[in-house]
Amino acid sequence: RAALQAEIEELRATLEQTERSRKIAEQELLDASERVQLLHTQNASLINAKKKLENDVSQLQSEVEEVIQRARNAEEKAKKAITDAAMMAEELKKEQDTSAHLERMKKNMEQTVKDLQHRLDEAEQLALKGGKKQIQKLEARVRELEGEVENEQKRNAEAVKGLRKHERRVKELTYQTEEDRKNVLRLQDLVDKLQAKVKSYKRQAEEAEEQSNVNLAKFRKLQHELEEAEERADIAESQVNKLRVKSREVHTKISAE
């Protein structure tokens, strides 16, 4: 009977130890489940953050492409304005050359008129001696030359007017070219800032993906630990059941004696 009592005590101690192991395994199982749930939540949050960053990067890339296109358009416009300004400058030079040529012709014609006037004065002196026919010819020539001088003055006035118009156009094109250059610089600065922002978002997306991978590894590790804890809990439960059966058998045997 003492041996049976000792065996019962031993079984009771084993049962208590097994029960404690079962409870520890169940607690480990609960802790592992909570950690798995937490990691699952964190991983889902990181995945959402990654998707948002990817969308932001895509949107920023579209904005960068749009700004780059605007910068290219502004640059093309600036180049065209510079070309137009160069052409206008060339036309202005031609007009200036024409104006200078007309001015020289005007001076030559004025000198010719002066010479003819002088000859006319001489002719008047001859008229006193009977040279009326010569005087009439000279007067007709003077009127003809005066008409030519007047026409040249009109053409010169038109040339000066056109010259001033070209000068105003050159100033406008110069101003527009400077504004286009400033716009190109501003757009380039905006492109640089947007590209820096895209790089930052890409880096954040990579970090989020890396963290997601780390959490996934932790999740898999915890899942493995959870499976092991469940297995240990099942083993402990089986041992407890076996010990309970054995304990009942021992009590039955004692009662029978």
Swiss-Prot record:
GO cellular component, one term: myosin filament
The organism of origin for this protein: Rattus norvegicus (Rat)
GO molecular function terms attached to this record: actin binding; ATP binding; ATP hydrolysis activity; microfilament motor activity
Name of the protein described by the UniProt record: Myosin-8
Pfam families: Myosin_tail_1
Coiled coil feature spans: 1-257
BP term (GO), one: muscle filament sliding
Gene3D superfamilies, sorted: 1.20.5.370, 6.10.250.2420
Keywords on record: Actin-binding, ATP-binding, Coiled coil, Cytoplasm, Motor protein, Muscle protein, Myosin, Nucleotide-binding, Phosphoprotein, Thick filament
Quaternary structure annotation from Swiss-Prot or TrEMBL: Muscle myosin is a hexameric protein that consists of 2 heavy chain subunits (MHC), 2 alkali light chain subunits (MLC) and 2 regulatory light chain subunits (MLC-2).
Residues bearing PTM Phosphoserine: 33, 45, 58
InterPro entries per record: Myosin_tail (IPR002928), XRCC4-like_C (IPR014751)
Domains: entry comment: The rodlike tail sequence is highly repetitive, showing cycles of a 28-residue repeat pattern composed of 4 heptapeptides, characteristic for alpha-helical coiled coils.
Annotated localization: Cytoplasm, Myofibril
Cited function: Muscle contraction.
Gene behind the chain: Myh8
Superkingdom field: Eukaryota
SUPFAM superfamilies xrefs: Tropomyosin
Broad class of where this protein is predominantly found: cytoplasm
